[in-house]
């Protein structure tokens, strides 16, 4: 699952590396972004590996009827925690699911509650990885990678 499709860049990268039988469900609330992503994914020849869904995560998540082994969160930073909790309560993420939260370094001030949940709730084993922001040598960002217990 990808929360935040934008133009499909991450969807192309993720779907090009997943197993043959796997599929990425990518959710975005912006219809224009979905249209651009659809073109990019099609151009990459990966349209059979990506299911694009238009709507907010809080609308779409309750409709999902599968378990995810990987979740990439890269949408509105204030929604990271609430959407993660929704995935938990809907039992979409179970033991050993990897949750990859992007851009938590440059938005760290908005991430305190998210960090507290994945680091201290006992539900996850979590680690933060810092690196230079893509295409910017002077700005650092981070990702938080959490494995569901």
Predicted regions and their residues:
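Short, well-ordered coil/turn elements that cap or connect secondary structure elements
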Residues: 19, 45-47, 65, 94, ...
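Active-site segment flanking the S-adenosylmethionine/decSAM binding pocket
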Residues: 49-107
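Hydrophobic packing residues within well-ordered alpha-helices of enzyme cores
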Residues: 14, 37, 61, 83-87, ...
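SAM cofactor-binding core of SAM-dependent methyltransferases
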Residues: 1-58
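Conserved protein kinase catalytic core
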Residues: 8, 34, 60-62, 80, ...
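C-terminal substrate-binding/active-site "lid" region of AdoMet-derived donor-dependent transferases
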Residues: 81-149
């Amino acid at each position: 699952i990808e929360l935040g499709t934008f133009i499909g860049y991450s969807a192309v990268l993720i779907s090009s590396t997943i197993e043959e039988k796997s599929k990425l469900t990518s959710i975005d609330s912006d219809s224009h972004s979905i249209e651009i992503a659809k073109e990019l994914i099609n151009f990459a020849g990966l349209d059979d590996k990506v299911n694009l869904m238009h709507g907010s995560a809080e609308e779409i998540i309750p409709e999902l009827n599968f378990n995810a082994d990987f979740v990439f969160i890269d949408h509105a930073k204030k929604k990271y925690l609430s959407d993660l909790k929704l995935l938990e309560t809907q039992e979409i993420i179970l033991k050993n699911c990897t949750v990859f939260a992007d851009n938590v370094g440059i938005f760290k001030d908005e991430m305190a509650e998210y960090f507290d949940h994945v680091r201290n709730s006992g539900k996850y084993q979590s680690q933060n990885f810092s690196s230079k922001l893509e295409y910017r040598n002077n700005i650092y960002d981070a990702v938080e990678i959490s494995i569901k217990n």
